[in-house]
Each structure stands twice: as C-alpha cells, then as structure tokens.
A protein has these predicted regions:
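N-terminal secretory signal peptides and thylakoid transit peptides that target proteins
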Residues: 1-18
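C-terminal segment of classical bacterial N-terminal signal peptides
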Residues: 22-25
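Extended, low-polarity segments enriched in aliphatic/aromatic residues
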Residues: 27-271
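Small side chains
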Residues: 18-20, 72
Length: 271
C-alpha cells in the first residue's frame, strides 16, 4: 500500500549533526545502544528521513528524549541570509539546510514531542526569526506545518519572555562564571544543537558545540553594548568574545558589567 505524505510530513529530507538532552534521569534509566551514529546520505532527497530515523534508532530512539516534552532546537543560521557562497543558497552552503530542519521537526513530532521551538540569535538582527528566514528564501510555515506545535524564537533578546535567565558554567568557566540567556533555553526539557559542518576562520571548524556560541544574546554580549544594562535591540556581533581580544581590559570590563546584571537564576536545567 503506498504511503502518502501529509502536510506534517512535508519534507522527507534531512540529516542531523548533533543532539544533546537535558533530561538526565530518563537518559540514565534507558541508556542508548550507541553514543554516536554516522551514516552516508548522498543528497537532501527522499532517503534522508529514513536515514535519520535509523540513526536516531541507533542512539536509543527519539521517544525517550522528546516524548511529552518541550524541545529547543538551536539552528545554525550564521552569516547573512543574502550571502551566496559560490552561488549556492544559504542552506546549501553556510546555513543548516531547510530540509534538515523540517525532517528533524517531523521525526520529533512523530516521536511525541509536546512542543518544538526553533531557536537562533542571528548576528545583530532583532527581526522575528520567521522574517530572517524569509530573507534567505525560506518559508517558516513549512517548519510550523511539520509538527503539531512548532514555534520560532529570535533569542538575541528577551523575545516572548520578560527576563533573561542566568545559567552557571560548571567549574567557573573561562570567560564568564555564568551566562544570561533567553527564556527558551530554560523553558525546554530537551536541547538539540542542529549544526552545519563547515570551516570557521576563528574556531577552525563549526560543529555542534561551536553552534551553541550563538546561544548568547547580542543585546548583552554584543561588541558595543552599554556597560550598565542590556540593549533593547541587538546592534553588533560577538566578535570581542571570540578573538584574542577576549583577554583585553575592555573585555574584562564587559565581563564585570555582565556579572552585575540582575536576572532570574536558572535552576531547572543543566547543560
């Protein structure tokens, strides 16, 4: 009997670079059969969803990570939406591919996720994430139609929240003992870094951990943010924190200023 794709199964294409979860109790009770899964898939075509499905199965299945939970997916949309590297679209070059996003949303929804929230802090932009995607030729309604409850949030500022939330760094951190983040990083049970494998002039390579550098809002960690309080809107990138200048007196003043910001301390999740 032929299988007919519904609207919520609209995109039968994708591959995932990395996944992490913040629900450790259930993880400990049901250990995965593997901690890493690697598969070859030659295109963003119809083979990607079954390939992804097998990979998630090798990791113990999506259900134990997402069923009944709110999932935060940090996308990699670094670089201008209008940039065309080698004449390629953003998704075929420096952004995570839109079909990858759609396929992951579809599979997580099928596995029982209660809510899926797509997250990104796009450089110095305060526009809704839907609008930022539109500038690259993406239609955000495709992602929202791939699951029962899908939301998008620009995490460069407060977004739909009223406060930034403080996340402590284990063992004190190297630059900051804690970070102030958008509410979406607290209001999730499972966190996923959906990265794009590419080279990077500062880090050398971008993978799942480097993708999380974009979690920090440029309203607080931007290069030209005021010393005494967060900006209302982002104005610049985070270059000062990703270069040797991070050890400079100016960066030290920024760290002292950020430490003094009042925020709700995050106690409900770990990284």
């Amino acid at each position: 009997m032929p299988h007919v794709l519904s609207r919520r199964q609209f995109i039968a294409t994708s591959a995932v670079a990395g996944i992490g979860a913040t629900r450790f109790a259930s993880w400990a009770r049901s250990a995965p059969s593997a901690t890493v899964s690697i598969a070859k898939c030659g295109s963003y075509g119809a083979d990607l969803v079954p390939t992804l499905d097998r990979m998630f199965g090798q990791l113990g299945g999506l259900g134990r990570l997402v069923q009944g939970r709110t999932v935060g997916i940090k996308l990699n949309l670094t670089g201008s939406p209008q940039l065309r590297l080698g004449g390629h679209s953003a998704g075929a070059a420096h952004w995570v591919h839109p079909r990858m996003v759609g396929a992951v949303v579809h599979l997580m929804d099928r596995a029982g996720a209660r809510r899926i929230r797509l997250l990104e802090s796009p450089y110095a932009s305060a526009v809704p994430l839907e609008e930022y995607m539109f500038q690259a030729g993406w239609d955000a309604s495709d992602f929202m139609g791939a699951g029962a409850r899908v939301e998008l949030e620009n995490t460069n500022g407060l977004g739909r929240g009223r406060d930034y939330h403080r996340f402590d760094v284990p063992k004190g951190g190297l630059l900051f003992p804690s970070y102030l983040l958008n509410h979406s990083f607290l209001d999730c049970d499972t966190f996923v870094s959906l990265a794009k494998l590419k080279d990077h002039m500062t880090a050398g390579v971008t993978l799942s951990m480097k993708n999380c550098f974009g979690n920090i809002p440029t309203t607080i960690y931007g290069d030209y943010v005021k010393q005494d309080e967060p900006d209302l809107a982002p104005r610049s990138g985070r270059g000062l924190l990703s270069t040797p200048e991070a050890a400079s007196p100016r960066a030290s003043r920024r760290r002292s200023s950020i430490r003094s910001h009042r925020a709700t301390r995050a106690t409900g999740c770990r990284a």
